[in-house]
């Protein structure tokens, strides 16, 4: 609050908060408290003497005026609790963090934000938005102008057709209008008499005036005659006449040359007019809609008083504009009387500057024109190539933004409704308090004015005196500084020769520096040339290397092609081998069968004819053979010899089988390794299993089982805490188990096909091989039995059984499993035979 000395108030800020319930309650409480505390006791002494009472009243009024002049001191606690950010009602109003004191700062921030919004909106400056607006409006504007220009010929044709029809029917119009001739004559007579009566005095008054200005009119006529004579002199003389003739000649040539142009233009005009006439129907709908809407609008504005109000507003605006025109014209004339010389100087100076800038501006314009023209030429194909992408982008963005706006519309509507309702409620609650607030501010203003008004003149006088005293120092300061500056200028001038010498020294140094710079540039050029040479050599070497690589690739491709051709030939020959083997084995089988039959038949015939002689001879032969064999070989038991012979035969057959199956086993191991790598890489191993037999699958299963056991041992060696490692190994074990299942299925399938399928049994090669193998077996059995029978060995004894089993052992091998088991038995027998010896 102000005191007798006065307090300068820098700013009174008002901050309006939407929540006014607490504000109103606190304001009412504080006002009631102030009313209770502000109490004054006025002592009144009553006297019956009227004169004394009047004097006391005057004295009291003088005291009140004196106290009012001193000011009213009201103790108000405005201490602000900075920790709790609360300082009471007045503290909140006049200085609190959330009081009226922050309204100025908030208003300044709001103004800054509004200015920033004006400068930048959505990340784009005003210039950028102007550019966006131009780009957005350019295409529609060009389209509208082009459409109007395209429709203009048809509209002109329509109006021209209407005018031509009216001209052609003018006689009919005149004939139709002739019925109005009597009425028009009556009207003309009435109007003419009115003009005659009214204008007769006027023209009578003009008579003396015309008589007075007759000499002046004659002077004007003389001037016109002189002007016509001057023009005639120019056009009738030889140069003027030649120019007129040339103009007429060139005009004729121009009109002659316009013939094709007009023909083409007329054809284009007619074509465009025809197309526009076909589209007149499409123009009727919008025109009809416009006229209907315009009629409805006119009916509305003329019936509800809007038009009358608009005319009144227009009248007021027009009056203000015309009044402003008068005032501006008067002030402008006054300003022109004062600004004639300065404006003339400005125009002359600006003209001189512009004329001097014309060469530079011309160069800049040429530069900009060339650069922008070249830029446009180069950008045109780029824009053409990007046009589909721009169209797709515009369509996509349009769809996306339209959908987003449609989705955000209801939400923003609800938010706007909430904000509008809140602000409306807050302003409605604040509105009743504004008169009291304005009254309070008015009281503060009145007190400030009352308190400061007596002191303003004295303060102004004091400030004027201070300014005058300061201004009186100016001559002294100038008179002191000017001599110092005058003395300083020669000292500064003494430095100029030194600076000139320095510049001259630098200029003298330039001839020395320039050769050095040229040498450096030459060295740099040589270095660049060397680099270019090295680069060229490297490029050449790379080109040669590329050519070598291409030749190598070409040779490799030729080798692969030749290898492929050779492989095809080998495959073709291999495909022919089964047939050749089949035919050979078939013939061999037939020959063997026939020979066996002939041999057996001969034996049967011979034995049948000489049974007794054969028996005796066989006994002698057997005895002699046995003795000879025993003597030659040094053996006592032929059965033992034949037993070992059968064993050695089986062992040799096993070795042969092992040597024959060794490549197959190695191949199975290789395929198992490939299968393991395929499982590690996660590829499908089905292609590897194609074309494999049961034995190879069994070997693969054994390899996989060994790998599974190894991984299981490795998994058991990993600590249980390492779940990731154990899980990884378990995944590998699961993959191996799944692969074993696939191999087992493949083995079972092959086994089932071999046992139950008819395909293998129907193969001629298999039949031939089986017949070939069964023929010597049968022959050996029959011959052996007959021989044993001849030498007296028959029945189920040890020798006959051993020989029979040996023959069956040698020739009855049906599968690889049997061969492997035979190999194991032979190794065991060899060990036993060695121990027995």
UniProtKB/Swiss-Prot annotation:
Q: What is the superkingdom listed in this entry's lineage? A: Viruses
- By its UniProt entry, which InterPro entries does this protein fall under? ARM-like, ARM-type_fold
- Listed disulfide bonds for this chain? none
Q: What's the name of the protein?
A: Minor tail protein Gp26
Gene (UniProt):
26
């Amino acid at each position: 609050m102000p005191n007798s000395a006065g307090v300068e108030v820098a700013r009174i800020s008002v901050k309006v908060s939407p929540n006014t319930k607490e504000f109103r309650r606190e304001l009412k409480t504080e006002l009631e408290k102030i009313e209770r505390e502000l109490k004054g006791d006025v002592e009144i002494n009553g006297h019956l003497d009227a004169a004394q009472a009047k004097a006391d009243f005057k004295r009291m009024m003088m005291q009140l005026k004196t106290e009012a002049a001193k000011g009213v001191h009201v103790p108000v606690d405005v201490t602000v609790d900075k920790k709790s950010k609360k300082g009471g009602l007045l503290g909140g109003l006049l200085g609190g963090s959330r009081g009226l004191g922050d309204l100025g700062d908030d208003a300044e921030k709001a103004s800054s934000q509004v200015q920033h919004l004006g400068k930048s909106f959505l990340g784009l400056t005003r210039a950028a938005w102007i550019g966006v607006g131009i780009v957005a409006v350019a295409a529609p504007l060009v389209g509208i102008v082009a459409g109007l220009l395209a429709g203009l010929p048809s509209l002109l044709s329509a109006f021209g057709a209407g005018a031509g029809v009216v001209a052609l029917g003018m006689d009919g119009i005149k004939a139709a209008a002739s019925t109005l001739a009597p009425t028009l004559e009556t009207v003309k007579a009435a109007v003419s008499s009115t003009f005659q009566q009214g204008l007769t005095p006027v023209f009578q008054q003009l008579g003396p005036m015309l008589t007075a200005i007759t000499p002046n009119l004659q002077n004007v006529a003389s001037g016109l005659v002189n002007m016509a004579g001057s023009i005639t002199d120019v056009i009738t003389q030889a140069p003027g006449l030649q120019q007129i003739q040339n103009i007429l000649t060139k005009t004729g040539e121009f009109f002659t040359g316009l013939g094709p142009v007009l023909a083409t233009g007329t054809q284009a005009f007619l074509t465009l007019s025809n197309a526009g006439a076909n589209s007149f129907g499409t123009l009727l709908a919008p025109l009809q809609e416009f006229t209907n809407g315009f009629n409805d609008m006119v009916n509305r504005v003329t019936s509800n008083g809007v038009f009358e109000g608009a005319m009144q507003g227009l009248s007021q605006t027009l009056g203000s504009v015309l009044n402003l025109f008068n005032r501006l014209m008067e002030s402008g004339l006054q300003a022109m009387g004062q600004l004639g010389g300065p404006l003339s100087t400005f125009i002359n100076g600006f003209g001189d500057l512009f004329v001097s800038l014309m060469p530079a501006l011309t160069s800049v314009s040429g530069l900009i024109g060339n650069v922008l023209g070249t830029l446009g030429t180069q950008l045109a194909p780029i824009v053409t190539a990007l046009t589909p992408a721009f169209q797709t982008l515009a369509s996509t963005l349009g769809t996306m933004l339209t959908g987003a706006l449609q989705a955000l519309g209801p939400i923003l509507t609800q938010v706007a409704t909430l904000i509008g309702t809140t602000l409306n409620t807050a302003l409605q609650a604040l509105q009743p308090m504004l008169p009291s607030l304005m009254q309070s501010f008015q009281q503060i203003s009145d007190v400030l004015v009352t308190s400061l008004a007596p002191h303003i003149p004295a303060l102004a006088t004091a400030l004027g005196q201070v300014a005058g005293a300061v201004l009186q120092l100016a001559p002294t300061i100038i008179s002191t500084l000017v001599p110092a500056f005058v003395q300083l200028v020669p000292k500064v001038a003494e430095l100029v020769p030194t600076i000139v010498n320095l510049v001259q020294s630098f200029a003298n140094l330039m001839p020395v520096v320039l050769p050095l710079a040229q040498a450096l540039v030459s060295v740099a050029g040589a270095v660049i040339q060397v680099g270019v040479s090295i680069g060229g050599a490297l490029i050449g070497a790379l080109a040669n290397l590329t050519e070598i690589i291409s030749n190598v690739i070409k040779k490799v491709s030729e080798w692969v092609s030749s290898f492929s051709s050779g492989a095809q030939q080998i495959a073709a020959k291999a495909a022919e081998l089964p047939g050749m083997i089949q035919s050979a084995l078939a013939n061999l089988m037939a020959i063997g069968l026939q020979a066996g039959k002939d041999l057996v038949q001969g034996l049967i015939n011979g034995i049948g004819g000489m049974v007794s002689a054969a028996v005796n001879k066989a006994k002698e032969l057997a005895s002699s053979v046995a003795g000879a064999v025993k003597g030659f070989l040094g053996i006592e038991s032929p059965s033992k010899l034949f037993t070992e012979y059968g064993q050695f035969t089986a062992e040799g057959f096993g070795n042969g089988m092992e040597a024959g199956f060794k490549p197959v086993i190695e191949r199975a191991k290789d395929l198992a390794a490939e299968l393991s790598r395929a499982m590690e890489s996660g590829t499908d191993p089905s292609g590897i299993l194609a074309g494999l037999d049961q034995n190879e699958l069994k070997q693969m299963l054994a390899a996989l089982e060994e790998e599974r056991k190894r991984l299981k041992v490795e998994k058991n060696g990993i600590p249980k805490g390492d779940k990731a490692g154990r899980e990884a190994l378990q995944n590998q074990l699961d993959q191996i188990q799944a692969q074993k299942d696939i191999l087992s299925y493949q083995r079972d399938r092959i086994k089932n096909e071999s046992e139950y399928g008819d395909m293998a049994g129907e193969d001629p090669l298999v039949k031939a091989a089986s017949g070939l193998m069964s023929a010597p077996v049968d022959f050996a059995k029959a011959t052996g039995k007959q021989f044993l029978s001849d030498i007296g060995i028959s029945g189920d004894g040890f020798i006959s059984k051993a020989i029979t089993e040996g023959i069956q052992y040698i020739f009855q091998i049906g599968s690889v499993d049997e061969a492997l088991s035979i190999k194991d038995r032979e190794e065991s027998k060899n060990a036993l035979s060695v121990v027995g010896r």
